[in-house]
Amino acid sequence: MNSFPAQNLMLSATNANKDSGLRTSNAHWLHSCIAVPKTTGIDLSQEPPAEGVMVPQSHLFPPPIRDSRNDTETVKQKSVNQSPSKALKPKPQRKKRSVSNKSKKTPSIPETKREKKNLDINIDISSFDTSGVPPPVCSCTGVSRVCYKWGMGGWQSSCCTISISTYPLPMSTTRPGARLAGRKMSNGAYVKLLARLADEGYDLSHPLDLKNHWARHGTNKFVTIK
């Protein structure tokens, strides 16, 4: 008797297949006969896959691990986009600037009533005689000060400028040795003022106070002279 009956069965099966003319595969026999060590990590309890059967990739590779941080970030973005409270918040109204700063600025010159200039008045000053009229004065400091001659028959204040009112005027910082220039009135504006006051009944034998007749800025050259 043979002490290896399994080998005899394998030989008899292969010889029978050869005689019948069929091709055989010894993979199954080899798999069943070859001993696999336990250290290989292969689970022997599972049956080997049949020949020609595709094994799904889910059994070969583990499923990918999803990062929970991305899920939390997407949930936060959705909650931010879906919150209507931020989109419906009304814009805060801007506070209007108070006008108190302008009122706090007090000019050094006391405010006086200025006459309204009528630019449509045309006065013929060619026949108006100013030879007997005394030089004008300015009483912005409380005392009447005689004005200086300026230009071609014009007059300049000796005690006030647009911003200050004092006598004598302080020295100029831009022109060494000269004082600040006072307010000015051209000859045409002065003669026109005399003609208008004479029509109103003013006595031209007395010096004319130019305190309320100075121009607000610069000179009185805006009048029309004919």
From Swiss-Prot:
Name of the protein this chain belongs to: Protein BASIC PENTACYSTEINE7
Region (Disordered): 42-116
One Pfam family this sequence matches: GAGA_bind
Comp. bias intervals (Basic residues): 88-105
Function: Transcriptional regulator that specifically binds to GA-rich elements (GAGA-repeats) present in regulatory sequences of genes involved in developmental processes.
InterPro entries, per the entry: GAGA-bd_tscrpt_act
Family according to the record: Belongs to the BBR/BPC family.
CC terms in the record's Gene Ontology section: nucleus
GO molecular function list: DNA binding
Amino acid composition bias (Basic and acidic residues), ranges on this chain: 66-76
Top-level taxon of the source organism: Eukaryota
Record carries keyword Mitochondrion: no
Localisation: Nucleus
Entry keyword set: DNA-binding, Nucleus, Transcription, Transcription regulation
Tissue: Expressed in seedlings, leaves and pistils. Detected in anthers, in pollen grains, in young rosette, in leaf vasculature, in the lateral and primary roots, in embryo sac, and in the whole ovule.
